[in-house]
Amino acid sequence: MQLRAGVHRLLFVFTVAAVVGVSSERMFWYWASAPVDHLVVAMVYAPAVAGCLWFVDRYRARGLWGLVLVAPLLGYFVEGVVTPVVYAGGPVPFFPVWFAAWHGMLGLGILLFGLRHLLLARRTAALWGLSIGLGVFWGVWSTTMWLPENVNDPELIADAGAPLTLLGPADFALYAASFTAILAGCHWLLGRIWLTEFVPSRATVWIWIALTGAAVIGWSVAIPWAAPMFVAGVALQQWGLRRHARHGRPSLLAELDGRVAAPALLPLVAIPLAAAAVYALAWELEPAEGLVRYGAMYGVIALQTVVGAVLLVRSFLSVRHVAPPPELGHDRARDVHADPRPLDAGAHRATGAGAAGARPVA
């Protein structure tokens, strides 16, 4: 039974990582992005995603502000552990804020929890609207691939193993449709393997912490501020999440349990249609290089960074006066080692019979 629960948990993490990878990698650029390669992306993202899911469950992250408090962690776990990109701007936290918006809010917030909320609530009109918005964003951002500094980037060329080529409108439409199909398939599967709680074993947690720490220390050899920046960033988010956990209500994992019928996924077809339409229009209009650079690329980065910073500040303000629920008590809520969930939590733990999977929604 424990083996079955472990496999279930791994499949859940892998599928969530595949969803997040669509935004974090496939929307970000389209080079070296064959659908079969997405398996590798999911495996690379899986440890970071597992860490975020653990934080969501442990600190009962729920609602917009709880999600915003978790969002920067995905950026730190991916771009500060797997790669050192988050430290590239020096101790100034520009990249952490931007990645909180791109990795965290776009990946975890919109593609995972946002779409799932709308799918389970059967809010078809909102789902169509969000899908169109995502498609327009994808199409606009993909025009930045045309910039010389991107298409001629030595690191990207080395990763691809060959000179980079621009996708024409037809090829881009196929590309967007392929990864939207993966996104839709993952949401259908998540409805059948969803876990209402994510509680890894103590050994798994310590292994994860050890590997994460080793990676950050490794980056610190060349980047002295890497370890202090990583520890400070994660500790700050954990502080906010600990206060957020005092609301005593179920986490997003518990709230978003349920199956998604295949026909309900139809509105997602608007994502590749809108993306392809915007990309094809830009291809025909041939906008000036400066417009693409300062409008599409720097404009999107600036907007995401500002929005990310505002949301982060607002999320910390939202937890200033959260009182601990009666069942926890003030002492337990302040105990750094205590699991902040209610004492009787665990009816749906991903161990034993509690890992039975998703609960159908009528």
Region spans (language model):
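Membrane-interfacial loop-to-transmembrane alpha-helix junctions, especially the N-terminal start
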Residues: V7-F14, Y59-A71, T124-I132, F198-W206, ...
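Extended, charged low-complexity segments
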Residues: T212-D344, H348-A362
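N-terminal signal-anchor module of multipass membrane proteins
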Residues: M1-R58
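Alpha-helical transmembrane segments
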Residues: R9-S23, L74, S131-F137, W206-G213, ...
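Membrane-interface helix-loop-helix junctions at boundaries between adjacent transmembrane segments
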Residues: A61-L69, V81-P169
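Membrane helical hairpin/interfacial module
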Residues: S33-Y87, P96
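Hydrophobic cores of alpha-helical transmembrane segments in multi-pass inner/ER membrane proteins
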Residues: A42-L53, A101-R116, L174-R192, M229-G240, ...
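Membrane-embedded alpha-helical segments in integral membrane proteins
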Residues: V16-Y30, G80-Y87, G139-E149, A210-V221, ...
